[in-house]
């Protein structure tokens, strides 16, 4: 990621000379090989350097936040708490920190990478970065910054809340945004659907709801939707729960046949009916 998608073999010893200056060993230069598309590498760097993207988990002022410096960083912890990592990088430098016991026993007072390795990583990274300018991550050709709907991920539309995001050109979803839906509801009770009579008469209000529906490509039992529904059930905002019941009976519909007239004789195999509601 730090090299824009190129893999570079690390070298710990560059050269060894004897007392007379004779070279005993010198690391051979190995040509970097591309393993990730540069556009994908940039998006990963953008996500992992975005402090707002990790607010829910780590908070605004965690050890991972280095202020104005563009630093991508990732933490990691093994399930048994034996290994604890924080690895961060810019386009100039990579710093990785491991924390653990030398006898490989589980750690008792370290909960995650952000509380174990991150404090050490932060100090080392700030010291190293003081020697480099803040060049950020270069935006490769084919990547563009666009306005994206905050809920659906579709291109921003209809004034819904949106934010700026880096994307690979041509990868944004197209077509109708089915997550934002304008539902026809009763004027006197917007928790219920307008019935067909009210819809025909135009006697309804349009109200926005967020409809979260997903198909599970892996199992017959839609585990994705089960998880979504569980999350929706905990939300206080009713916009995640579109109504399913009508507000009142549609039995009051008055329909009059205008054509053909009563007792008319029909001699054609096709008949056109006209109604007045």
Residue ranges and their predicted role:
Residues 1-75, 79:
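A conserved catalytic-loop motif detector
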Residues 17, 25, 29-32, 70-277:
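Soluble, non-transmembrane domains of envelope/secretory-pathway proteins that act on or interact
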